[in-house]
Amino acid sequence: MSRRCTEVKRKSLPSNKYQSISAATPNQIMLASKLINKLTHHGNKELVEKMLDKIIQHIKHKYKADGFEVLESACNNVKPSLQVESLRIGGATYQVPSPVNELRSYTLAIKWIINSAANRTFEKSMWQKIAEELYEASNGRGGAVKKKDDNHKMAEANQAFSHLITKRRSRGN
């Protein structure tokens, strides 16, 4: 047993800019703030907020859809329900599937959307890449959805080892 204190989970406060939008639900505001925090480099949050404004306007003008709804549906289509953990037992390493916490699933979804947007080559700027990736993910296409499907296939392929994670957790390790 570890003698260290449990880490207190810090909540990231949503931007005041998006809280004032009455059309956005609290879940959409939470996803927007997660996206902003994941994209922020060197504390330059205002730059990323302007970039998110461009993303939402681009989706609104090009696809005639609400940007926050596209963000929410994209994250719901990309978020995983299972993840694969490496577990070393008796000199062998097993890939063991385990369920994903909902907050972690949204974090993984946003991370996968950003990574697959960064790998896109057709658009010039990052905000265009993210806007296109969000729209494709909301329609069930794109690199982030493929990453989720690959993750689920890996979990299904290693379903035989799922009993190991429950034994491991019940022992307290």
From Swiss-Prot:
InterPro entries: Ribosomal_uS7, Ribosomal_uS7_bac/org-type, Ribosomal_uS7_dom, Ribosomal_uS7_dom_sf. The keyword Transmembrane does not apply. It comes from the Bacteria. Pfam families: Ribosomal_S7 (PF00177). Gene3D superfamilies: Ribosomal protein S7 domain. One of its GO terms (biological process) is translation. Coiled coil: none annotated. GO terms for molecular function: rRNA binding; structural constituent of ribosome; tRNA binding. Keywords: Ribonucleoprotein, Ribosomal protein, RNA-binding, rRNA-binding, tRNA-binding. The keyword RNA-binding applies. GO terms for cellular component: small ribosomal subunit. Part of the 30S ribosomal subunit. Contacts proteins S9 and S11. One of the primary rRNA binding proteins, it binds directly to 16S rRNA where it nucleates assembly of the head domain of the 30S subunit. Is located at the subunit interface close to the decoding center, probably blocks exit of the E-site tRNA. Belongs to the universal ribosomal protein uS7 family. This is Small ribosomal subunit protein uS7. It comes from Orientia tsutsugamushi (strain Boryong).
